């Protein structure tokens, strides 16, 4: 809670005599630290596995019982982790499926416990997360009976998509196709309707190599028709003036991830939207892929993110912070701290 401001009458009078008046009050308000909102502590299910964190043993034990291991990275106060537990795992059929087919092992993104990877390498929790390039929480890694990652979810996805992920990764599923094709077969993307529009989207035809030549970063929004998550992104995040300002340094384009729309990639390749999405491994709608002014992919959003995290993604690339700080979570912390130091409240769940 913000400290109660006290402005003594004599100081107020002195400010007015000095010609400061209202600006003096405004300066004092700006000196206060803003609040950090939206953090929520999560009680993780008691049926998560209590592991010695030697993953080769965990994989073997799970395989012996006809299950697979899921490594679940979380962090303290993470509202997206809380959503996974309270919105997804709270649904009886999802909980039953998870418990029947998987041993879930929770790791703290910033934790110091000792872990041993499947190949025998020792790490702390946080170093293991860094080695795996975990940039978001929750991140879930589904391991097969040999310890190979068969599916990775980077961030929170809604219950329907989450359950499809469980079906794909469960023991014995043997889908015979990649997860992208599996999702397409399960969800049957609509061929009718239209994509959500936004004022910052460039009109086709798209030659993204031109943007790179002009030294401008590129933001590619892969979406689909009849997409509730896309609707939510546009309504609650992309329509916000601060989000629009954060996107303004970018050449932003919107692509139907299943369409045959022709384009030229930042690297100069002529391809269709569908073909490029497949090359990039885009599976979730909406996915936002951010490219530097050099044409290299820096980071992507392929899960549900609200305003603060979405705006931070664009700031991370446009401001060049990724060149000095490879850990996006640390960048988030630094950005929130800087905003609060200027007196702004930061709500990470808005």
Describe every region a protein language model picked out:
Residues 16-23:
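C-terminal segment of classical bacterial N-terminal signal peptides
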Residues 25-69, 76-92, 109-135, 139-218, ...:
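Proteins that catalyze or organize thiol-disulfide redox chemistry
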């Amino acid at each position: 809670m913000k400290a109660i401001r006290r402005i003594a009458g004599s100081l107020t009078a002195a400010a007015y005599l000095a010609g400061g008046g209202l600006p003096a009050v405004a300066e004092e308000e700006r000196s206060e630290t803003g609040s950090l909102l939206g953090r929520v502590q999560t009680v993780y299910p008691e049926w998560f596995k209590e592991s010695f964190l030697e993953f080769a043993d965990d994989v073997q034990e799970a395989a012996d019982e006809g299950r697979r291991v899921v490594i679940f990275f979380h962090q303290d106060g993470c509202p997206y982790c809380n959503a996974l537990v309270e919105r997804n795992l709270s649904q009886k059929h999802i909980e039953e499926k998870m418990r029947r087919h998987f041993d879930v092992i929770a790791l703290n993104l910033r934790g110091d416990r000792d872990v041993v990877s499947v190949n025998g390498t020792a790490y702390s929790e946080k170093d293991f997360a860094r080695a795996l390039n975990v940039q978001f929480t929750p991140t879930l890694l589904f391991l097969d009976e040999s310890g190979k990652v068969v599916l990775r979810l980077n961030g929170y996805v809604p219950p329907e998509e989450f359950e499809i992920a469980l079906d794909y990764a469960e023991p014995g599923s043997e889908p015979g196709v990649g997860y992208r094709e599996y999702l397409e077969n399960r969800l049957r993307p609509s061929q009718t309707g239209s994509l959500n529009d936004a004022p910052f989207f460039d009109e086709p035809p798209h030659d993204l190599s031109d943007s790179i030549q002009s030294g401008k970063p590129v933001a590619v929004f892969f979406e689909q028709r009849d997409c509730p998550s896309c609707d939510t992104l546009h309504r609650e995040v992309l329509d916000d003036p601060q989000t629009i300002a954060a996107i303004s340094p970018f050449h932003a384009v919107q692509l139907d991830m299943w369409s045959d729309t022709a384009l030229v990639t930042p690297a100069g390749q002529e391809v269709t939207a569908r073909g490029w999405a497949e090359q990039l491994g885009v599976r979730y709608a909406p996915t936002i892929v951010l490219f530097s002014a050099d044409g290299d992919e820096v980071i992507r959003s392929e899960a549900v993110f609200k305003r603060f995290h979405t705006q931070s993604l664009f700031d991370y690339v446009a401001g060049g912070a990724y060149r000095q700080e490879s850990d996006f979570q640390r960048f988030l912390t630094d950005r929130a701290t800087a905003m609060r130091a200027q007196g702004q409240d930061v709500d990470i769940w808005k």
